From Swiss-Prot:
Family named by the database record: Belongs to the UPF0173 family.
The UniProt record lists the keyword Hydrolase: yes
Hydrolase among keywords: yes
Organism listed in the record: Listeria monocytogenes serotype 4a (strain HCC23)
Keywords: Hydrolase
GO molecular function: hydrolase activity
PANTHER family to which the protein is assigned, alphabetical: UPF0173 METAL-DEPENDENT HYDROLASE MJ1163, UPF0173 METAL-DEPENDENT HYDROLASE MJ1163-RELATED
HAMAP family with a match to the protein in the record: UPF0173
Gene3D superfamilies, per database record: Ribonuclease Z/Hydroxyacylglutathione hydrolase-like (3.60.15.10)
Name of the protein: UPF0173 metal-dependent hydrolase LMHCC_0991
Length: 228
């Protein structure tokens, strides 16, 4: 399985002949190396409804026929307002089997809304995501602050990789993310959600260097991938 990082919180997972795109914020994101019109994933997974995470989901899903996996409130909105047909609604605590493996949604401490036609629309609870693919567990924290039940996520799902936001201001910063890494005890920690905008400017290498002894961190450059 190959996992690549494409700026902000966008990652791509390729397992066998299946491609999964997570939080595809592409258009308007100078830090992303992808082009929305070229993406043909089989699945799109969304952590929450903010524009810098839903991103180009509607265009990509309509072009590719991808199934969109997300919380049920966001799924309903995308179906009714944007005409998406292949939706897989879930909610926090639930898990579901797909052709590529299992998805389980966890809590995240953040918001989830958009502005449509001048009105603010609440899009349900934000989530983290635990993928179980090829007998590997990948935790994608989404946008969140630090919370102590991250210990439980790590205990219930021994993690091979954890993607953690470090940008501060809108999510936990590097200091809290280092504590999150301690709680989760993943084999590998990858920072995300930083340097897209001035408000979330961070040094990811400094974050990796701050991790507790025994915790391995890796900064993925834009377009870089790991294989697990």
């Amino acid at each position: 399985m190959k996992i690549s990082f494409h700026g902000q919180s966008c990652i791509k997972i390729i397992t066998g002949d299946t491609t999964i795109l997570v939080d595809p914020f592409i258009s308007g994101n100078e830090k992303c190396d992808l082009k929305a019109e070229e993406q043909m994933p089989d699945f799109i997974v969304l952590s929450h409804g903010h524009d810098d995470h839903v991103g180009d989901t509607v265009e990509i899903a309509k072009n590719s026929g991808a199934t969109v996996i997300c919380n049920a409130d966001l799924a309903s909105f995308l179906a009714v307002e944007d005409g998406l047909e292949n939706m897989a609604p879930m909610h926090i605590g639930g898990k579901r089997q797909f052709s590529f493996g299992q998805v389980k949604l966890t809590q995240a401490f953040h918001g989830s809304q958009t502005v449509r036609d001048g009105r603010i629309v609440n899009l349900g609870f934000p989530t983290g995501i635990v993928f179980t693919i090829e007998d590997k567990n990948i935790y994608f924290a989404g946008d969140t602050g630090l919370f102590s039940d991250m210990k439980l996520i790590g205990e219930l799902n021994p993690l091979d990789v954890a993607f953690l936001p470090i940008g501060d201001n809108f999510t936990m910063g590097p200091e809290d993310a280092a504590i999150a890494a301690r709680f989760l005890q993943a084999k590998l920690v990858v920072p995300m959600h930083y340097n897209t905008f001035p408000l979330i400017a961070q040094d990811p290498h400094k974050f990796v260097a701050s991790l507790d002894e025994g915790i391995t961190g890796k900064v993925l450059e834009i377009g870089e991938s790991i294989e697990i």
